[in-house]
């Protein structure tokens, strides 16, 4: 049987990237992409080992962001990021601070939370 030589993939370096933070009331998702929007690494608070009501805390969001930042720095050599925040969750500020404390340079922070301009009709009010 003939031995097949495998050529290792060249390690791509992305010095600049975009961090998408989606903070819901129950969870926080952190997605690191390149400038074109291709996902490089992603994580969530639940994937970092938090469960239940601890998932919605700012501390948990900071830990998830720290995990994503270390992953992006080690695997892709990322140094400069731009942050895009979506959602009304509590973990957004802690996640941004975690990226800064890991040694990444944050160039811009944009809040792109979708706000309805009197869109769909709300559910009826609860009468207790």
Curated annotation (Swiss-Prot):
**Cystines in this chain:** none
Is Chaperone among this UniProt entry's keywords?
no
- The yes or no answer to whether the keyword Transferase is present is no
Q: Which GO terms describe its biological process?
A: translation
Q: Name one GO molecular function term.
A: rRNA binding
Cross-referenced HAMAP family, in alphabetical order? Ribosomal_uS11
Q: How does it assemble?
A: Part of the 30S ribosomal subunit. Interacts with proteins S7 and S18. Binds to IF-3.
What's this protein's family per the entry?
A: Belongs to the universal ribosomal protein uS11 family.
**Know the name of this protein?**
Small ribosomal subunit protein uS11
Q: Which organism is it from?
A: Wolbachia pipientis wMel
